[in-house]
Amino acid sequence: MQRSPYTPGSIAPVVYGREALLRDARRDLAFMKEFPELKGRLEIFVGSRGVGKTSLLRTIENDARSLGFDTCWITSGDGPFLSALVEALDTLSRDWQDAAREQLARVLRNLSVTVGGVKFTGASDAEPREVSSLGRVVQQTLQKAAEGTTSPGLVLLIDEIQAADADGLRALAYAWQHLQSEAPGLPLMTFCAGLTHSQDVITDAVSFAERFRYRQLENLDPEASRAALEEPALARGVHWTPEALDIALTLAAGYPYFLQVIGDEAWKAANYPDPGEVIDAPHVSEANSQFREVQRIFFRSRWMKATPLEQEFMAAMAAEGGAPARRGEIAERMGRTTQSISMVRRSLMDKGLID
């Protein structure tokens, strides 16, 4: 018996179908190691839940570490974004040499995030005073962090960026703008991941968009889907029969999370196969009942997260039968104006229920 190599709901150890994105990220890391300088734009991977954004971000983090970079992981949404940034940088600097650690610690001590903005105190411990430019404070913090590392550079990785507060996003954008013109040789880059409407959230927070580059993650194509099922099994000496593979691919329809689910359930149905054994069609047929139950729970949990009005919106969308639904058509089915459903649509996007 062997443990299942499939990881539904967990970080995937191997990311399939994202080779172009990984190739670009690895090239950027290699260039920064050889030619230290600021990566001009923040890279943001966007897509629906379950398409592998966080797994992609973790893979880039591992690649960066393998090249000797310091990395800083931030998950947005659990409190102010800048609080999370301060905490992550503080944790990072604990292994630094005393002088560099104290320089960054001095900046971090001077930065206390409040609901309405940022306050800081000088070395004299005077009363806190409002900072005229939050972006400048974040710029100073990032600059000290990147200068303090003894590695080839610092890589920031920001997950769930659509959940970051507007003040934090605005400060990050302006800080990056300042760094581009004032510290172009700083070895610092940022990769982010977020839901499909992340661009709307960021645009609402800051008027300029040229600091960000958005990369869309879609469902996997047939070749990548096949690899996502076959290769983990082959690594353990187990083969899928062609018929079993075709059935599983049809069930998952290219959705990365469902590929992991059907792979995991088929592995269990095959009784955790040893090297040399196979997963065949009867195993997938047996796995299908549990796969359908996972799907039912998956969709029900999302449906129950929605308010009655949001459920009405999704029902109106579903009337298109899978085709892209226009806002005007949805509003007409709901008997409402296009403007009146804007907040409902945005709420559903914030919850990750629609794209």
Language-model segment annotations:
Residues 1-41, 91, 184:
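A short, basic N-terminal segment
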Residues 37-166, 188, 336, 349:
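P-loop NTPase nucleotide-binding core
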Residues 155, 163-206, 214:
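Sensor-1/coupling segment of RecA-like P-loop NTPase cores
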Residues 239-251, 325, 329:
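Short conserved motifs of the RecA-like P-loop NTPase core
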Residues 254, 260-338:
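Winged-helix-like regulatory helical subdomains adjacent to P-loop NTPase cores
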Residues 349-355:
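A short, conserved structural fragment
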Residues 217-244, 262:
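Conserved small helical "lid"/interfacial subdomain of P-loop NTPases
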